[in-house]
Every structure is written in C-alpha cells, then in structure tokens.
Amino acid sequence: MASGDVEYRCFVGGLAWATDDRALETAFAQYGDVIDSKIINDRETGRSRGFGFVTFKDEKAMKDAIEGMNGQDLDGRSITVNEAQSRGSGGGGGHRGGGGGGYRSGGGGGYSGGGGSYGGGGGRREGGGGYSGGGGGYSSRGGGGGSYGGGRREGGGGYGGGEGGGYGGSGGGGGW
C-alpha cells in the first residue's frame, strides 16, 4: 500500500474468544460500509488473541462506529474501540520503553500508574499475549511506546501506542 493511501480502521479490543471475523463485521456494518474485518489469531495456537481490526470505506462510518461501539457488549464482553494508527505512521515502530517494554509503575501496571499496561501484568491469556501481555500495554502518555498486541509478537512492538509506535514494529525491547 502506498504511503499516501488513507485507511479508516478501528482497533477493537476485549473480544470474546468465540467472536469471529463475520460476527465482528456484522456488529460494525450498521455504521457504514465495512471493507475488511479481521480477528488477530495466535500464530501458534490459532486461537483469537482477543482483538481485531475493522476497516471502513469512509471516515464518518469509522468515527460513528467508535462513538457507537466503544464500551458496548459483543458476544458477552464489553469491547474497546479506538481509531487504529496506520501502518505507515509513527516512525517505523521504534519502542522507547527500554528494558522490558515500558513498565514504569513497578508491579506490572494497571490502567494508569505512569505508563503501565492497560490489562495488567499477564494480559487476558496464560503466558502473555492478549490485550496487553508483557510489553507495555496501552499507554496514554507520549513517551510510553506501548504495545496493544502484547509481548509474544515476533520482534516485539505490537500495535501503536505513544510516540513512535507503529503497527507491527520491530524495534527496541518490547515483549517478553
């Protein structure tokens, strides 16, 4: 994809393990034309990692979906919906957390605590992965460099977060 292309993509977190691509698309189609819906699966087990992405045809549909779906129930779970960072932005995925991926609050985080992880220490699955994993988590602070995807993603990184985030970044010490 050329760097000038614009995608209207939402990050959807907190998904039930049973939610599939089709259920995700169906839930979001009421807001506009869905171009793509994708649940991210663990490459070793094939199971859902509890998050995914929905891409819309236009910006209005994306913004309406974020407004309408964030905090709503889908398949028995309250989901989080945010605008996804494009793959081309954020300086190529540099990870500024240093060391083990940006835990700053000592005991593994909690929602604020100076750049800790959104989901706490181990994510929502055994052995890391899931919504936050071991690699920093969602950080609303500029220097956090957090990782939505969690620590088990090859090469560290993960989705977005902080300055210099970037989807699928391979820089720095992110992850386990």
Curated annotation (Swiss-Prot):
Keywords: Acetylation, ADP-ribosylation, Chaperone, Cytoplasm, Immunity, Innate immunity, mRNA processing, mRNA splicing, Nucleus, Phosphoprotein, Plant defense, RNA-binding, Secreted. CDD domains: RRM2_NsCP33_like. It comes from the Eukaryota. Residues 88-175 are annotated as: Glycine-rich (GR) required for cell-to-cell movement. The modification N-acetylalanine is found at A2. Gene3D superfamilies: 3.30.70.330. InterPro entries: Nucleotide-bd_a/b_plait_sf, RBD_domain_sf, RRM2_NsCP33-like, RRM_dom, SLIRP/GR-RBP-like. It is found in: Cytoplasm; Nucleus; Secreted. This is Glycine-rich RNA-binding protein 7. The lineage of its organism: Eukaryota, Viridiplantae, Streptophyta, Embryophyta, Tracheophyta. The gene is RBG7.
